[in-house]
Amino acid sequence: MEVTLKEFRELCTSISTESSYVKKTKLISEFIHRGRDYNDVYIITKLLLPGTGKLIYNINDKQLVKLFSKIFCHDADEMYKYVINIGDVAYVIGSFLKKSKSVVDYATESTLTLHEVDCFLTRLSTVTRENDQIKEIKKIIPRCTPNDLRHIIRLIKHDLRMNIGPKHVLSGLHKDAYGIFKLCNNLEQVVQRSLEDNIKPLIELMVPLQPMLASACKTFSEAVKKCPNGIIVEFKYDGERIQIHKHDKNFKYFSRSLKPITPHKVTDFEELLDRAFPSAKNMILDGEIILIDTETNQPLPFGTLGINKKSMYHNACVCIFIFDCLYFNDTVLIDKPLIERRNIIHANIKEIPNRILLSEVKNISTDEELSKLLHIVLSKNIEGFVLKDAKGVYEPGMRRWLKIKKDYLDGCVMADKADLVVLGAYYGKGNKSGILSSFLMGCYDTKSEKWCTVTKCSGGHTDLELQEINDNLSVVPFDRNAIPDWLSINKIHYPDVIISDISLAPVWEIIGSEFTRSSTHTASNISIRFPRCSRIREDKTYETANNLNDIKQLYAVSISPPEE
């Protein structure tokens, strides 16, 4: 018998009211393994993780209100006032459905199946015109109770309000399912293998893996402890992460956030990669894409890969620095030592100057050798360097590498920049009157599952950039009497406006003179002194920005005493 939306709603309610993550996972496990077949388990898992799927609707709260106001024949502004006051667009739309009985027929008993809901969501993701969206919504409303509709809206918003993420959902499927998901990022494969109890390391060509990451490091002794098998130092250029997949004659390129790389950044690279790796039938490479000045052979600053910025540099071309190989000619390499993976690249690459290059590395064993490298970093346009265990395996999604960035080397007390999310903003005064000119920056606390405030940032933007931010930032007035459930904030930092949809909030790289303590900020009382925006991280999303655990680690590194 098919799983109904009502059963799914009841599961979500049980999960949302349970505070223990172990018990949340147990609820999911019991529901999933209740004699379900593959199709049921896959749909349940997919809908429990609406944010990890491939369905994109590009419909924010205002657009949802606009669509349903036309269906319900209600004033959109009136509906939206309720959304601002209550902070829950799904609840508001469900309530207005009840008020619209004379205009719209709706169900008094829930009979929708999850399969029907999944089909509706798939159709909705394929239409972009307002009239077509309304047409699809009108088809399903007669089958919906108000509670059904609320839940469907939450699926569209990728937020079921259960305070749970992929790790806990997939652990309910199989104890090792989350580890495999990080490798292949393919939910269908994970579900199938979990049900077959065939959980083995899985890499699928043309499907991105979670990239291996680096955490901040301040001293050589720390690096020695974390890299007991010898240290490989790799120069870190200020570019964009790229994961390259080749299968026969086909190529795909993925960003750090696992999204396809903008095509103009990788034009002509199929032919270049074939020349650089002539023996490769199939492969997965990890690297950094940057713009290089062809006259000086020096990398250009971050952000120059955009179409407009790139056109300003006439003597420049896009270059990919390859620093790792995860798969080569039908052989999975992630469990091989780094030295062996590097040797495979070295044996198979034919470098193309300024286009395809093997990243430069050094083997070091003493503090003196590290000091010499510091001078190279300071004298060149290099962001810093990454320290890697010479015999380390590739662990997708894990921060096992170490990084030392130039900002610390230049004398800044901060050991790292922080990638924070814009939570709200404040109107300026004087010549900036009426313009949002100061921004409330924050991070996500995985324990409380709330967004915490870190700092207020008003520097780093030109007037033109500030105007673009004002034009593009999606905000609503901040209501002091209806603070959103997702936000942890003290009264002193209440903004004038707040981000309307946290999933659409931009990520900015914030740098300052130092991390500091602040009793008024809610990110474990950690803040940043003299903050400024050093760049807008278009390659990151609210999900991949630094979370509170990252901020705590960065703070700890910044206050640890220097090595004598």
Swiss-Prot record:
Family (UniProt): Belongs to the ATP-dependent DNA ligase family.
Gene3D superfamilies reported for this sequence: 3.30.1490.70, DNA ligase, ATP-dependent, N-terminal domain, DNA ligase/mRNA capping enzyme, Nucleic acid-binding proteins
Alphabetic keyword roster: ATP-binding, Cell cycle, Cell division, DNA damage, DNA recombination, DNA repair, DNA replication, Ligase, Metal-binding, Nucleotide-binding
Entry's Gene Ontology molecular function annotations: ATP binding; DNA binding; DNA ligase (ATP) activity; metal ion binding
Catalytic reactions of this protein: ATP + (deoxyribonucleotide)n-3'-hydroxyl + 5'-phospho-(deoxyribonucleotide)m = (deoxyribonucleotide)n+m + AMP + diphosphate
Sequence positions that bind ATP: E234, R241, R256, E288, F323, R399, K403
Chain positions recorded as a divalent metal cation 1 binding sites: E288
GO biological process: cell division; DNA biosynthetic process; DNA recombination; double-strand break repair; lagging strand elongation
InterPro entries for the chain: ATP-dep_DNA_ligase, DNA_ligase_ATP-dep, DNA_ligase_ATP-dep_C, DNA_ligase_ATP-dep_cent, DNA_ligase_ATP-dep_CS, DNA_ligase_ATP-dep_N, DNA_ligase_N_sf, NA-bd_OB-fold
Disulphide bridges: none
Pfam families cross-referenced by the UniProt entry: DNA_ligase_A_C (PF04679), DNA_ligase_A_M (PF01068), DNA_ligase_A_N (PF04675)
Co-factor(s): a divalent metal cation
Binding site residues for a divalent metal cation 2: E383
Known role: DNA ligase that seals nicks in double-stranded DNA during DNA replication, DNA recombination and DNA repair. It is not essential for viral replication and recombination.
Protein name: DNA ligase
Residue positions of the active site: K236 (n6-amp-lysine intermediate)
Secretion signal span: none
EC number: 6.5.1.1
CDD domains: OBF_DNA_ligase_III
Lineage of source species: Viruses, Varidnaviria, Bamfordvirae, Nucleocytoviricota, Pokkesviricetes
Domain of life: Viruses
